[in-house]
Amino acid sequence: MAQPAAIIRIKNLRLRTFIGIKEEEINNRQDIVINVTIHYPADKARTSEDINDALNYRTVTKNIIQHVENNRFSLLEKLTQDVLDIAREHHWVTYAEVEIDKLHALRYADSVSMTLSWQR
């Protein structure tokens, strides 16, 4: 009988990037918070101590950081899709979800967030 999927959660990854369409947003980095959920069958990793038997969340996180910090985005939707594409790129991934909060985007609100998901 197959085991339920393992779930990796990258919580509150705080980064700064260029996001938005207003001049101030184009010229100044803004704080964002990224949350990623990844499901994968960890059958080998459950009984192993070999990193090659597990989905390496450090590699995923480093790829997200590199992409977000080295690019500019007009739309939160595009940024969220790009991060989702990174989260789901390993062939073991069966489900991925990304939520990105753009902090202080609206007056009187802590943030505005966008959530996108993908399933194999």
From Swiss-Prot:
Name of encoding gene: folX
Reported phenotype of the disruption mutant: Cells lacking this gene show no detectable growth defect on complete and minimal medium. The folX deletion selectively eliminates monapterin production and secretion, but has no effect on the intra- and extracellular folate profiles.
Pfam assignment, any one: FolB
Keyword field contains Thylakoid: no
GO MF annotations, alphabetized: dihydroneopterin aldolase activity; dihydroneopterin triphosphate 2'-epimerase activity; identical protein binding
One GO process term, biological-process aspect: pteridine-containing compound biosynthetic process
Function: Catalyzes the epimerization of carbon 2' of the side chain of 7,8-dihydroneopterin triphosphate (H2NTP) to form 7,8-dihydromonapterin triphosphate (H2MTP). Is required for tetrahydromonapterin biosynthesis, a major pterin in E.coli.
Keyword annotations from UniProtKB, A to Z: Isomerase
Reactions that this protein is recorded to catalyse: 7,8-dihydroneopterin 3'-triphosphate = 7,8-dihydromonapterin 3'-triphosphate
Family indicated by similarity: Belongs to the DHNA family.
Claim: Disulfide bond is one of the keywords in the record: no
EC number: 5.1.99.7
Disulfide feature: none
Entry protein name: Dihydroneopterin triphosphate 2'-epimerase
Cross-referenced InterPro entries: Dihydroneopterin_aldolase, FolB_dom, GTP-CH-I_C/QueF
SUPFAM superfamilies given in the database record: Tetrahydrobiopterin biosynthesis enzymes-like
Cellular component GO terms, alphabetical: cytoplasm; cytosol
Gene3D superfamilies: 3.30.1130.10
Species name: Escherichia coli (strain K12)
Oligomer status and interactors: Homooctamer.
